């Protein structure tokens, strides 16, 4: 791993974006647009996916675009799961009219649930893109990334299947559920281990529209 880190082509701008996103979390936040949401998800998690793609010595740069999307999808899951907890800290990442103060009252359940559903649906788009990039990674890395992704995605899917009961607190995927998801994923993980590296070029699989709101941020598809 240390050797991989030494040979990875890190861009200091990526680190700066990550630090900027983390520092921004120290104060109150009231997002009002989808662009703000996606740029934040990129800053605190998409950059992590990008860095990991480089550390794993991805076979093609195309992998970076998908890695950003997977990191962003996981952050969207975090946001959906923690909407009440964040509101209690004065933070509102979901772009909607109710403020963090109004969210804390739990009186606008239907409106908040509707916006929460939109964020979960958005995360599914980015999960799909993220998982499409797995075959650009070295074979032995693919199952770990896949399992991590499906376990995280299960949180937002469970939140949705339970009726978007955000006001009841964090949705948790328990040990039995996680074990079942892992067992069920094993055939696909085996396929990932033997699947050849994708030979598509940089414009082949990734949808550039997914990075439209990221406005030339480091590593994005522009």
PLM region spans:
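Catalytic cores of Mg2+-dependent Asp-rich isoprenoid enzymes
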Residues: 1-73, 80, 84-222
């Amino acid at each position: 791993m240390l050797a991989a880190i030494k040979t990875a082509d890190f861009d200091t701008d990526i680190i700066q974006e990550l630090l900027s996103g983390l520092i921004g979390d120290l104060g109150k936040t009231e997002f009002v647009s989808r662009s703000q949401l996606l740029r934040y998800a990129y800053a605190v998690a998409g950059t992590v996916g990008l860095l990991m793609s480089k550390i794993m010595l991805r076979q093609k740069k195309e992998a970076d675009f998908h890695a950003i999307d997977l990191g962003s999808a996981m952050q969207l899951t975090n946001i959906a799961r923690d909407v009440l907890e964040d509101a209690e800290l004065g933070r509102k990442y979901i772009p909607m009219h109710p403020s963090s103060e109004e969210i804390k009252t739990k009186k606008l359940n239907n409106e908040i649930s509707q916006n929460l559903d939109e964020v979960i649906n958005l995360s599914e788009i980015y999960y799909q893109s993220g998982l499409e990039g797995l075959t650009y990674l070295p074979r032995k890395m693919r199952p770990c990334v896949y399992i991590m992704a499906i376990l995280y995605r299960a949180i937002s899917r469970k939140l949705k299947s339970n009726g978007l009961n955000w006001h009841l607190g964090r949705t948790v995927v328990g040990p039995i559920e996680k074990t079942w998801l892992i067992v069920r994923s094993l055939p696909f993980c085996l396929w990932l281990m033997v699947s050849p590296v994708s030979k598509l070029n940089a414009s082949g699989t990734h949808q550039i529209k997914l990075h439209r709101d990221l406005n030339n941020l480091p590593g994005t598809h522009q």
